[in-house]
Amino acid sequence: MEKRILLTLLLALTSVAGLRGQSDGYEWPTDPQVLEKLDRWQDLKFGVLMHWGLYSVPGIVESWNICNEDWIVRPEGSTYEGYKQWYWGLSKEFNPVDFNPDQWASVFEDAGMKYMIFTTKHHDGFCLFDSEYTDFTVAKAGPFASNPRRDIARYVFDAFRTKDFMIGAYFSKPDWHCEWFWSPYYATPNRRINYKVDQHPDWWKNYVTFTKNQLGEITGGRYGKLDILWLDGGWITGDEVGLNEILPEARRVSPGLICVDRTIQGPNENYQTPEQTIPETQLDHPWESCMTLGNDWGWTPDPHYKSARRVIDTLAEITAKGGALALGVGPTPSGIIEEKAAVILREIGRWLRRCGEAIYNTRITERYNDGNIWFTASKDGGTLYAVYALPEGESLPPEISWTGNVPKGKVTVLNNGKKVKASVNKDGTVTVYLPKGLVEEPVALKFSL
């Protein structure tokens, strides 16, 4: 029975692989439950990736500023060691007195998002869960440690479960605060461990044990069933920190758990995650573009958020290429999603409530793009959708045209439910005449072939 399920799911997921680009290193899972969950995840299309932590207090670029690499920009006149100590000291200031995960979940539900990924620990090592293996956690360090909701991850996951989101835990494999990763005995020249493992094997052994223990805390049931384990920090592989020892128990607790050991390739990267970019063509396996709503992953005081129109256009392109969009939105230092972001997200959600049929539960089609138009298909292939991505600063034209994907009968405009005619020219070009009175937003069309 398991072999038959596995074969069916593999065929369903790869049935149009010949139409798409290939990526080196992707390995399809062999666990039928993982394949089944991947298929369900591919129905969702739109999720949120939340970065929150010490870096949110001053509103800087996540924890990267404590990494001593040439591309990092720190305040003029600051020393590296002085800056690092200042950053660690933010653990005494992190005090999200307005922490409201229910508000987060409501905002993202209103946006039409269907899955979430939350940073339990970024590279700086500061844990947003109550870890037994370090004191560098919100539950033990700083003023929020006395708050009854100090085990932040628990409340975040629970809030999103009530909204039927798929639940994802982000976890950084590198931990710059841990003495077994960045030893205080040596300088820290870059993001990697700052000692030679062959000279200090016990240090590395201690780090592997520490990481396995923390992963066990997150995946072992204390935080409920998880759908996605999203592992960041690709300069260390999951294999190096005992991931293969953790996963069997994690999947016993959370059957079908999707593991994303990102950028590593191989059997534990169940879907791939291009960052701040979209692949040029369709891909032949599950993938997600993780992209920010503003310029940065965490909250900043001057975010320069993308418009709802731009996010919708991006989502249409990603969906037509077979992927999902994890949109980065960071909570404020006080613990809410700011209204400036919520307004944009609600506008996206209003469009998806009317036009989401062209996005959710769809699969790719051979002719997937013509200019500003992105095509998707229903799972059975009997219905096609065309999303006209309306570029910034442009108005809707009275008609839109494409080649191929010739409609059979009338075309439904999902934005307002009206049916319109489509004409086919001698050269095979399809022209659809848009009804008057449409809002200036991307247009989604539905038709049969």
Predicted regions and their residues:
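General helical structural elements
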Residues: 7-8, 49
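Positively charged n-region of N-terminal signal peptides that target proteins for export
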Residues: 1-4, 108
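Mature catalytic domains of secreted/periplasmic carbohydrate-active enzymes
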Residues: 22-449
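N-terminal targeting/docking segments
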Residues: 5-7, 123
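Bacterial N-terminal signal peptides
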Residues: 8-15
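Short, composition-biased linear "edge" segments at structural boundaries
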Residues: 17-19
